Amino acid sequence: MQLLIDMVVNEMPPKRKMIYKLSRIKGLSNEQIAEKLGIQKKTVENHLNIALNELRDALALSILVYLILSV
């Protein structure tokens, strides 16, 4: 599963990838990320929402493919 996450994250636009990594890997809050990057907190939230939706969709698709192939 980590390989799938890494693949999806690597395909993200640079700013979204950076925000995701600062949040999930470095553990920074949305406020800290916004301050560090000089952007609005809402922008950080939007990027994280999109990133998590992309990861969720990729995981759902991989589970579906696995289930279809295992029948």
Please give the residue ranges for each predicted region.
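Residues within the DNA-recognition helix of helix-turn-helix
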Residues: 4, 47-50
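Short, Lys/Arg-enriched N-terminal segment that forms or immediately precedes the first helix
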Residues: 1-8
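Short linear motifs centered on Gly/Pro in flexible linkers and helix caps
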Residues: 2, 42-45
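C-terminal edge and immediately downstream basic/flexible tail or linker adjoining helix-turn-helix-like DNA-binding
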Residues: 52-71
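Helix-turn-helix DNA-binding module
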Residues: 10, 14, 18, 26-43
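A generic signature of intrinsically disordered, low-complexity regions enriched in glycine/proline
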Residues: 10, 34, 50-53, 57
